């Protein structure tokens, strides 16, 4: 199986190794001093492996296959989808971070747009990988630039990281905000301000 860093896009199909994942979970249980053969834990390696297969499903999906539907709507104004729920996994501690993504773009001169559900699926695809929030935000923006050729893209992600809430500094409720700005939103302050105002407006 080709090993690829999650920062790069897969050019081949990866496969989840269920037996290897189960064996690794069993070893982890032993390492923390547990008995993986006791009743409550006997099926845990298989359950965790199946959960990881779902949680990291974005590793096995091509972003180009998600943004595969375009519509020639001759639309040249902002398209903004707010409050897209996301659940991801911090690659440093393998614990969850969760929150929302706001994704906006201004179609290119050809007026091409994609389906609204495709944007939500794109967020899911990149969230379902071992991640850092900064990279997640940029990957969503760059995928839209690549596939849609828009005049501008703005992505804002707000998330709470359980690695800060349940361990370490233990600051539950702290929210991290990241943004990725491309094209017209980067060069035109008025366009950027309009999009950010709509995002912040409840």
UniProtKB/Swiss-Prot annotation:
GO terms for cellular component: cytoplasm. It holds the Pfam family GTP_cyclohydroI. Its EC number is 3.5.4.16. It is an enzyme of class 3 (hydrolase). Zn(2+) binds at residues 90, 93, 163. GO terms for molecular function: GTP binding; GTP cyclohydrolase I activity; zinc ion binding. GO terms for biological process: one-carbon metabolic process; tetrahydrobiopterin biosynthetic process; tetrahydrofolate biosynthetic process. It comes from the Bacteria. Homomer. This is GTP cyclohydrolase 1. It comes from Mycobacterium ulcerans (strain Agy99). The gene is folE.
């Amino acid at each position: 199986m080709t090993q690829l860093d999650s920062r790069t896009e897969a050019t081949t199909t990866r496969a989840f190794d269920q037996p290897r994942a189960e064996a690794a979970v069993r070893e982890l249980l032993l390492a923390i001093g547990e008995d993986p053969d006791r009743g409550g834990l006997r099926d845990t390696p298989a359950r965790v492996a199946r959960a990881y297969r779902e949680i990291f499903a974005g590793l096995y999906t091509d972003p180009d296959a998600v943004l595969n539907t375009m519509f020639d709507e001759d639309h040249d104004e902002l398209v903004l989808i707010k409050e897209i729920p996301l659940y991801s996994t911090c690659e440093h501690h393998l614990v969850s971070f969760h929150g929302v993504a706001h994704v906006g773009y201004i179609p290119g001169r050809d007026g091409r747009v994609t389906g609204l559900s495709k944007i939500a699926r794109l967020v899911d695809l990149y969230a379902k990988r071992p991640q850092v929030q900064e990279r997640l935000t940029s990957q969503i923006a760059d995928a839209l630039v690549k596939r849609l050729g828009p005049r501008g893209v703005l992505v804002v992600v707000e998330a709470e990281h359980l690695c800060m809430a349940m361990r370490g500094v233990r600051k539950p409720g702290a929210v991290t905000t990241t943004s990725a700005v491309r094209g017209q939103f980067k060069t035109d302050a008025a366009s950027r301000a309009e999009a950010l105002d709509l995002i912040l407006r409840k």
